[in-house]
């Protein structure tokens, strides 16, 4: 069984745990419709992505 040679310092333990926290999702305002959407995602209401029509708009 593996056993650590040294005690993990509180600083190292905290740095390891810093990635475990849940982060709130980010949203950006869509330029065309003004709706909130996730960055780098298609606006599902208008079907636009980066100024191009990639899906048919939902009614």
From Swiss-Prot:
May I ask which residue range the UniProt record assigns to the signal sequence?
A: none
Ribosomal protein as UniProt keyword = yes
What cellular-component terms does GO give this entry? large ribosomal subunit
Q: Which GO terms describe its molecular function?
A: structural constituent of ribosome
> Gene3D superfamilies from the entry?
Single helix bin (1.20.5.640)
Bias class Basic and acidic residues marks the residues at 28-44
Keyword annotations of the record: Ribonucleoprotein, Ribosomal protein
Q: Which terms under GO biological process does the entry name?
A: translation
List the biased-composition ranges (Basic residues). 1-16
Region annotation Disordered: where it falls in the sequence? 1-59
What family does the Swiss-Prot or TrEMBL record give for this protein?
A: Belongs to the bacterial ribosomal protein bL32 family.
Its recorded name reads Large ribosomal subunit protein bL32
Which organism was this protein described from?
Brucella anthropi (strain ATCC 49188 / DSM 6882 / CCUG 24695 / JCM 21032 / LMG 3331 / NBRC 15819 / NCTC 12168 / Alc 37) (Ochrobactrum anthropi)
């Amino acid at each position: 069984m593996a056993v650590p040679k040294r005690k993990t310092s509180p600083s190292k333990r905290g740095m390891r745990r810093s990635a475990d926290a849940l982060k709130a999702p980010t949203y950006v305002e869509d330029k065309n419709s003004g709706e909130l959407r996730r960055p780098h995602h298609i606006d599902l209401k208008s079907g636009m992505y980066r100024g191009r029509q990639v899906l048919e708009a939902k009614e």
